[in-house]
């Protein structure tokens, strides 16, 4: 099934759908009291949408949407739950993944409500590098996955598109970002403006200190992404969807 940009799956309740993203890019979002959308998590190919609230049959104010044209494979809630019930190991891995998802989702939401526009963009790029591990070139620069457009970046970080374009142009002029073949390539120096709240063993009550390392670290403040730790460790789950 192909979802056009902005289309949503039916998630939540006792008739919710679960979608395996085959291509494109999905996202989790919610609306504030002014009906503005806020994206707090990205869902790349190979990951699931609708699998969290469909576990509980709760209806929540979160929309599982296609950020761009996205191909998905849909399965009904009852079928998915029956599969988990018959595979306890996968069910446990899935539950752990849900917990990890919520942790990173909260980081993404906090970042988008507390960081400056420039820091949000740097945090998004840092998250893509950390979680999807693109290979650095000879100059220590990282090609970002997904070839995000300025419009998509503005949607993700909740910043007006002209502001995003202005920041990207400034980063390019300072040698921190290069655009090649519709793809952004970023220098690790861009991440120097981010903070590491766990640096030097800092706890929740400790003062946040600036991170001085040039290479990105796993503990950098980052916008949420369905990352590698959230991925189901058992390869039978994709096989289950392939057989539908």
Positions of PLM-derived features:
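Phosphate-/nucleic-acid-contacting segments
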Residues: 130-230, 240-244
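Cyclic-nucleotide recognition modules
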Residues: 41-107
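Polybasic "coupling" helices that flank or enter modular domains
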Residues: 92-156
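Cyclic nucleotide-binding regulatory domains
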Residues: 7-68
